[in-house]
Structures are given as C-alpha cells and as structure tokens.
C-alpha cells in the first residue's frame, strides 16, 4: 500500500538524493528504459519482498509514461542472503536463512528478465561485527550473482547497496558500519569492473543522520531493519533519479494528486502484491511461513485485467 509521508524532516532528507554518489549519468526527463527492456526483475530480501518501493517506482512510470509498457517482477524473498550464511537459531530456530544460490536459476528461467535490480547485504552480515570470512562470503556471492545474470543474457544489471541499519542505541554506528563496508566494496566494483551501482546505503545513512539531528526520535525503520513508508519513498525517489527522472521532493503527493492517480497507484500496488506471491510460488523456494500465491497462469490473467483497468483510467 502506498501511504503519504508525514515526517517534517523528510523534505530535508530528500535534498541528499540530488548529490548522492551515483554510478550513472545525469538527470533527464525521458523514458528510462531502452526498447529492448520489457521485463525488470527485482531480487532481494524482505525489504524488497514488501514491495512498496517497487510499487512506487512502477506507479510513477505508469502515470508519467502511459504510452510505454514494462513489467516489474518482484522476486524478493524474506530472510534471504546471497552469501549463503545463516546465524544459529535464526527465526527462533524454525528455519535457516534461505540462500539465493538455491533458486536463482529457476527464477531466471521462468521470468526471463531483460534487466535486474539486486539489493543484498543487510542479512549477509548476519547482524554480527565485520569479519573477514563473512565479508568474503558476501563478496563471493555478489560475484556469483553478477556473473550468473550475465550468463543468463540479462541486458542490464543494477546493484543497490544495503538499506541503512538503524541501531536502537548507536543509531548509524555498529552494524550499520558493517553495511558501510559492504556498500563501499560494491560501489568500488563500478570503477573496477563497470558494474552499475546505486549507493542507497550512503544516501540513506546521511538522510537518517539529518533526520536525527532535527528530531532524535526520527527513524526509517522502527525495528532497525525494515523501513516504513518514508524509507520506501526515499528509495523510490533515489532509484528514479538514477534512472534519469526529474522527481519532485513530494513525489508521494504528486502521485496521489488526483482521484484518478490515487486509483492508478492502488491498482499498481494490488497487482504487485498479487504477482510477487504468484512468482515465488511458481519458481519455488525453501523459506517456510510464506503466503501461498495464485497459480501463475491465473495471476497473469488477473495482471492483464488490472492493466486494462489502468489503461481505462489513463484514457479518461
């Protein structure tokens, strides 16, 4: 669900988006995908699975480029890592963290993405101090992921550095410093190997620090890990800026500026919620306690129905 932001410091934090380090070009108001990009896959953990930043991103494109069609597939899986690591007693001992290695090939075969956004790291350090072996496992996993996507013929790959970790006591220190190290390594791969990287971690950490300076109670994630709507809006705006979009600071208000727009945003969010569980069910995974989605064929039919509803609204 897309919910307007209310925190007074949010407009200030958005200023950092304009100056944050991007491994990409300048801001241009044009369709951000080439004609060869038809299906975009999002890989990640529970933050990606929640899907709000993806729905926001899609809704912006739907409202601003009604003549273009593109499909966003959310294949995020809660608890997942790319490192293959899992802490002892994870989830109260009910199950270990799922490993992307186990399912990636099935996802790629089923989705056949032209482009992939991948965001890993927050779970890969398994909430422990920086350690050479864990850090090496993350780097190895990211190398494997990138090369797997290249071998699968993915035309464009964009890595997103980890979300900020907001420690209850140390705020942007502690485990967030571990994520900073992971992020710095990932950003370095842009210069070293030409990877596309969006440094969400640096931008969000800076924005959080600005928010805290204005209001010590300001948080993106009440549980330290999972951002609420403000954090998802921040992420959406950052990604849109990376995709050369001129995005206003009040993007949420712009998207919801009319009754028609509100309906479009709601339809996009509903479609995303339905499809993510259908895709996870169709491609399979080893993470228990997940919602059971519709059979993929049925979900795709409903996807088309919702697309038709959106088109009708756009033509009014």
Give the location of each predicted region.
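A short helix->loop->beta-strand "cap" motif at the edges of active sites that frequently abuts
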Residues: 150-156
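Bacterial N-terminal signal peptides
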Residues: 14-26
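Conserved catalytic region of serine esterases and O-acyltransferases that act on ester linkages
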Residues: 36, 52, 192-193, 215-316
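Acidic/histidine-rich helix-loop elements
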Residues: 74-99, 126-134, 224
